[in-house]
Design a protein with these regions (language model features):
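Short alpha-helical segments that sit at the start of domains
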Residues: 1-12
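Short amphipathic alpha-helical elements of helix-turn-helix/winged-helix folds
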Residues: 11-19, 80
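Basic amphipathic alpha-helical segments that dock to polyanions
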Residues: 16, 43-48
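Short helix-capping/hinge SLiMs at alpha-helix to coil transitions
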Residues: 17-21, 67-68
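A short alpha-helical element within helix-turn-helix/winged-helix DNA-binding domains
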Residues: 27-33
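Key DNA-contact positions within bacterial/archaeal DNA-binding proteins
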Residues: 38
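Beta-hairpin "wing" of winged helix-turn-helix
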Residues: 51-66
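Non-DNA-binding regulatory cores of transcription-related proteins
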Residues: 66-161
Length: 161
């Protein structure tokens, strides 16, 4: 499961990707993404240390994207904030640990299964970039805006449980 910190980082990056050459104040991102300001400060510093963001202090300053939205993939963001992507320590690539109860990794069915899960997850996260998330957001907003208000009223009436 993604941490709140990781989800907030992704939301902040998508917001910044809307105007990638702009300088953003913490308050602006906090207000737009509904992220607590103090929490966001630490997130942006982590992104800066990772080389994803740059910053300038003082008048006319703020945070900027150092990498293009197409260069920032979800695998990098998830690893930065949440560490290993795999569900079991023996299936991680960058944070490998042998499981205490494992008799033989080479024949372990749990490890074999979760290596496949990890590989598929990593590939998906690597292929999803901040740019692709912004495109998805734009598409979803467009689809939401194109819905007929009358049909959504009918759906609300029939959706009661």
């Amino acid at each position: 499961m993604l941490s709140k910190k990781c989800k907030y980082a992704i939301h902040a990056l998508v917001h910044m990707a809307k105007t990638p050459s702009e300088k953003f104040l913490i308050k602006e991102i906090s207000d737009a993404c509904l992220i607590p300001k103090k929490f966001l400060e630490g997130i942006l510093l982590d992104l800066k240390r990772a080389g994803i963001l740059g910053s300038k202090q003082g008048k006319g300053g703020g945070y900027t994207l150092r990498k293009s939205p197409a260069e920032v993939n979800l695998a990098d963001v998830v690893r930065l904030f949440d560490g290993a992507i795999a569900a079991v320590p023996c299936a991680t690539h960058k944070f490998y640990e042998r499981c205490e109860e494992c008799v033989d990794e080479a024949t372990c069915t749990v490890r074999a299964a979760f290596l496949q899960v990890r590989n598929a997850t990593v590939e998906m996260l690597k292929s999803d970039t901040i740019e692709s998330l912004l495109a998805t957001e734009n598409r979803l907003k467009s689809e939401k805006g194109n819905k007929n208000p009358e049909s959504s009223k009918k759906q609300k009436k029939t959706a009661r449980f």
